[in-house]
């Protein structure tokens, strides 16, 4: 239809409380912003305390409440502490977005160290696993809920010089599928979003490997990178909302067509 301007439904997630990890920058910040615009309350979690405070201050200009919680996801007590903080702030939790990741890549596969491997797996799949376990009883008590975990085309398609990162992201997809199958009868949905968007990680890659970056950009059928707030965030909001109540165990490629139905 022509002449129709898309509008954001401000009540899509009205009354929902959502945890977002890695929320200080990039994709996480874009998701948090989109959630707040659609009526959710957000607990923003990140290890960068100073940047997180600045992000939350900016996001707090809207009508919905947003709280900051600095946390190192490598700490084995962090998952329970994060969920407890969300319940304390908002009374309950309806959704979880596991976005946080850390990596020392790009590196050649043979140069990746145990420390590199441990970093990306601890902040990625292990923290994702533990946060899902920690939030489960809260979601169950609410009669259900939704979890969105962030994957990556680096894993689904394979990206040279991101061996550990790709493995960690595919581990997150495996965890997500298993939980989705097990928790479906509990009313808890689990899905994965794989974004290709302008972010700190993408910018770092562009600086380190500009030719590879340009090749990758040319491979996007839509001809551009996604915007974290207006392209990635809305898809996550949809998956957290009742509009997607029959959607679980799916990987959604929000990449401008790069994956091409693979």
Label each PLM-derived region with a short phrase.
Residues 152:
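Residue(s) in the substrate-gating loop at a strand-loop-helix junction
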């Amino acid at each position: 239809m022509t002449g129709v301007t898309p509008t954001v439904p401000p009540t899509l997630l009205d009354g929902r409380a959502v945890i977002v990890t890695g929320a200080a920058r990039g994709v996480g910040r874009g998701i948090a912003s989109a959630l707040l615009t659609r009526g959710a309350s957000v607990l923003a979690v990140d290890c960068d305390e100073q940047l997180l405070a600045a992000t939350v201050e900016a996001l707090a200009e809207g009508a919905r409440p947003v709280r900051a919680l600095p946390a190192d996801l490598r700490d084995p007590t962090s998952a329970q502490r994060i969920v407890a903080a969300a319940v304390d702030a908002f009374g309950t939790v309806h959704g979880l977005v596991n976005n946080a990741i850390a990596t020392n890549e790009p590196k050649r596969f043979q140069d990746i160290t145990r420390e590199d491997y441990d970093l990306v797996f601890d902040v990625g799949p292990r923290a994702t696993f533990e946060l899902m376990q920690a939030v489960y009883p809260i979601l169950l008590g609410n009669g259900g809920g939704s979890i969105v975990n962030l994957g990556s085309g680096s894993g689904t398609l394979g990206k040279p010089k991101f061996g550990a990162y790709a493995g960690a992201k595919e581990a997150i997809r495996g965890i997500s599928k298993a939980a989705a199958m097990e928790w479906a009868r509990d009313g808890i949905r689990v899905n994965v979003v794989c974004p290709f968007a302008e972010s700190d990680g993408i910018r770092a890659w562009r600086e380190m490997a500009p030719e590879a970056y340009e090749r990758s950009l040319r491979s996007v059928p839509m001809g551009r990178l996604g915007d974290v707030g207006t392209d990635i965030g809305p898809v996550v909001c949809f998956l957290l909302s009742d509009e997607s109540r029959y959607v679980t165990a799916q990987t959604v490629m929000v990449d401008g067509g790069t994956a091409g139905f693979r």
